[in-house]
Regions:
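N-terminal, positively charged/glycine-rich alpha-helical extensions of SAM-dependent methyltransferases
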Residues: 1-13
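Conserved alpha-helix/loop element of class I SAM-dependent methyltransferases that forms part
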Residues: 23-40
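A short acidic, Gly/Pro-enriched loop at the edge of an enzyme's catalytic core
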Residues: 97-109
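A short SAM/SAH-binding and catalytic strip from SAM-dependent methyltransferases
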Residues: 108-119
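A short glycine-rich, Lys/Arg-flanked "PGG" loop and its adjoining helix->strand segment in the class I
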Residues: 122-134
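Conserved beta-strand signature within the Rossmann-like core of class I S-adenosyl-L-methionine
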Residues: 135-142
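Conserved Class I S-adenosyl-L-methionine
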Residues: 150-156
């Protein structure tokens, strides 16, 4: 679960299935992060997937070729494996600073509101670079206090 997103003008709201309406604001954050990035027929990794709600949205609305959700919590991954039977999805337990996937295996890496909890953001970003294919995209949002934004910018 994330804090969600609401545009002031509400001009580009995603059209949602009725069963997704209760989760509109968290879904809107994912839609905002994805922006105009094409995910169809791409290999997508989400680091910090939690219980899979964001991944479910990405799979059902953007049709990636494959989706890999990675989370540190074995309980969250077990939840995803039991509850999220989505086509072309897999759920892996692992740390953001040592992603359990091979080099150059992803077209897109997504990270929503979890990097502030990681012990080493520079190591996480090194892992993102390692797993992205040439020309790949890193789609990222998180929160930082104002005095820590420039530190994050240096690492990006």
């Amino acid at each position: 679960m994330n804090y969600g997103y609401a545009e002031e003008q509400q001009k580009s709201l995603p059209s949602l299935q009725p069963e997704d309406e209760p989760f509109r604001y968290p879904i809107q954050l994912y839609a905002h992060v994805v922006g105009g990035t094409e995910l169809r027929h791409k290999d997508v990794i989400e680091v910090g997937c939690g219980r899979g709600g964001g991944g479910s949205f990405l799979i059902r609305y953007f049709s990636p070729r494959s989706f890999t959700g990675i989370d540190l919590s074995p309980q969250a991954i077990e939840w995803c494996r039991r509850r999220m039977s989505l086509q072309n999805a897999r759920w892996l337990q692992g740390s953001a600073d040592a992603l359990p996937v091979p080099n150059c295996c992803a077209d897109v890496v997504v990270n929503v509101e979890s990097s502030h909890c990681y012990p080493s953001v520079p190591q996480f970003l090194a892992e993102v670079r390692r797993v992205l294919r040439p020309g790949g995209r890193f789609l990222f949002c998180d929160m930082r206090t104002a005095n820590r934004v420039s530190e994050l910018d240096r690492h990006l």
